[in-house]
Amino acid sequence: MFWDSIPVPKGTHADFAVAVTDDSLAPWIKKGGTAYLRRNTELYDGDVGLFETDAGIVFRQFCADCRGTVYLFAVNRAHAQDDCMIPPDKAASLVCYGRLELKKPIPLPMD
């Protein structure tokens, strides 16, 4: 995976940044904005990560149930059809490049 190097401001916890080229993170980060990410950090329910999935490399909101099933929700609920479920036997191979650093958490979808 390759992307243009975007400088990360000092004083942030981010390790790298990527340009947001669509509305997948709206309304929190708009198209044309910058997403700041932190590598090698544990994900908790509600965290947004940059994942490698069958659909490509995408931003998704993470949630795992007590059985080990992982749910990756589209942050922009206009794209709810892009939500995916990863069964426990495949969840261990899920690749996350980093957790999105935000000032406020994004609520998990209720639909």
Residue ranges and their predicted role:
Residues V8-D111:
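Acidic/glycine-rich C-terminal interaction modules and beta/coil loop segments
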